[in-house]
């Protein structure tokens, strides 16, 4: 069958055969290459015996490739035939029992684990009996040639052309609408667009003319009517334009960029052809899950997830399987690029999701380094919940003749979220949280509680479980990737009534079943506040966000008042009467007046001339 990469064979538990005398020589055709111990001179040979791995004592068939075992023994110059050592480790039956490879070690051509054995039929590396059988079945059925087991650069490789090439054309109904009707529609939906020759918004997914398989996938995934950001962003993206998009959290931005990505990748005959960059593993995992749902049934459409915190070998193995869409965090993708394990020369569309988070987390240079390896003419889409000045600068740097699409207020929380601001001093926070969790009107599990430190998350989760009896857990960056994934799955499936989190769940994740968020600690910026509040109100659903505030957040008082009060929320008197708020307001108004005075307009032109003449006469 195969031999391990050592002198002694790992024998199956029912193998009672004995090895014969051997000489260390190159095997004949059909034999196996075996490496000897360089420190001890030995002579080896290879013989093959048919055994049954699953049924002891059962006669094996020479036609069954998974039942053949190559046997090797070591003898000195004067030694006779000896039995294998009774403690010899048996050949691994299942791939899950094999470890992951270390750098430079052989990799199983089937699953990407450590390639401990060499298949006697193909000379390829495999990790177990299970993968050997799968490997030979693939060869027999002619499903494609196997990839080399060693790390290898994945270049953009051509595939067979698609049977049908998709081209977006405006639906006849959209074409018949007058310009004033389109503008009225945009105003009613809160869509703001800047750019030249911008495509008209769609009103229904059917207006896109997608392949029927994709239309069915949209319905199965619960997409019935496009949201405002989807109405405008999808047709613009389908036409290949660069985009800067901003919308309320939970407004459907992910599907808005996934559909153009899928169509572009589906239409291209090179792999990989699309790249999506995200700041966190959790967000990347979620995006890949949504992408797979929408791609289901589309031929040759594969994704690969390249993120830190998960084993690298299976990611590299998946990358070699002619994937169309790469979903990655910048750091892991850069590592793979530096290993020359992937080429991005065939990329036609790039999406940078949660771009504001990328910049805040210090990933800007990593993003730029990744994009240097993509073609200069590829379509680029920047997506963000907020648009600070740094995003504007990045837009000027990366996008060519972009279309700017904004729905809602680009820096305000989602309108479907009821916001409650409570003045709570630090010693009273736990008591107030327990009151909320015991309030039948407010408590709607699962509840997401945000804190500002990892230790605080663990301690608060334990306190909630002890005092209220609710099933509670904590999640933060020190939890392993497996733990975080299981907690997130449990949150989505309703296994937890309360989840206490640091900012790890504050961005991008679709937690559609969360109806109540409590900001136990006020976020350090209003951008973070917008994102954490946005964990409720997903896709227009109503939700409640309660925030505890006190003088520890005094530098944000005026920002809170400006952004939250217009939504109709009642602010606590301690906040409204705070001297810090009034001082911040005064400084901002003074700065605005200075800016206005520095501008020359028809209204102030004469005043500026008089001031200039007066100052000149005094000199």
From Swiss-Prot:
Q: Which UniProt keywords apply?
A: ATP-binding, Cytoplasm, Helicase, Hydrolase, Isopeptide bond, Metal-binding, Nucleotide-binding, Nucleus, Phosphoprotein, RNA-binding, Ubl conjugation, Zinc, Zinc-finger
Q: Does the keyword ATP-binding apply?
A: yes
Q: Where is this cross-link: Glycyl lysine isopeptide (Lys-Gly) (interchain with G-Cter in SUMO2)?
A: 26
Q: Name one GO molecular function term.
A: RNA binding
- Just give the chief location class: cytoplasm
Q: Which residues carry this modification: Phosphoserine?
A: 64, 160
Q: Its quaternary structure?
A: Interacts (via HIT-type zinc finger) with the RUVBL1/RUVBL2 complex in the presence of ADP.
Q: What is this protein called?
A: Probable ATP-dependent RNA helicase DDX59
Query: Which gene is annotated as encoding this protein in its UniProt record?
Result: Ddx59
